[in-house]
Amino acid sequence: KKAADTLLDMLRENGASLFIFPQHKDEIIDILRNFRDRDAYDAKPSQPLERLEAEQFTTIEIDQEIQSLTSSLKSLGIAEAPRESYLDEIGSLKKNPAAYINYSGLSDHVLKNIPRYSRSNQMLQNDIDAISYIILQRDGMRYETIESCQSIFLTTNYSLVREANQFLRYSAYKMQISPIISDIDLTSILWIKYAMQNNNIPRLWLISAANAAVSPTA
């Protein structure tokens, strides 16, 4: 949590606008509901939520979390992302071919290489929609600096970052800001650029990375 708070603080301090995709907000609500309705004796428990487990949240308290999600996000300065149009300012279809990704190709690639997406077609569609939105908002342009980049899809899904950027031909060895980026990579960029005086950041991310290694995702 401290690492995430640090990242959000750096983004705000450097003028970033923070948004959540509506479909991902719905996913959060579904996760909370599944956790609320979980069967304690089920051999296959629902997705664990550390804070709720540790604090032993009741059903009523989880319902309150769901009801207050919008205001909680707002308190963090996170708004719901507006819909991106395929039309330009004068009502014409955006002409840059690079603004349109191979949607089915990317979906197939991600599904093939990240097994857990086979369990939820909706989750796959949500993430591919988000990537498509970002590239469309960028009008297919590639950026070399974080300041010039119009939008980024920030996620802790490191497998998705790897596979999507591989399919979209964003090499880790090129100085380009990819449309989808991990929280660790973005924090590293911001720390190097703006916050090297905060020597606590690397330690926070080492802790975060260690926690992720204990429970890796496919």
Model features per residue range: what roles?
Residues 2-151, 159-218:
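Active-site-proximal, substrate-binding regions of enzyme catalytic domains
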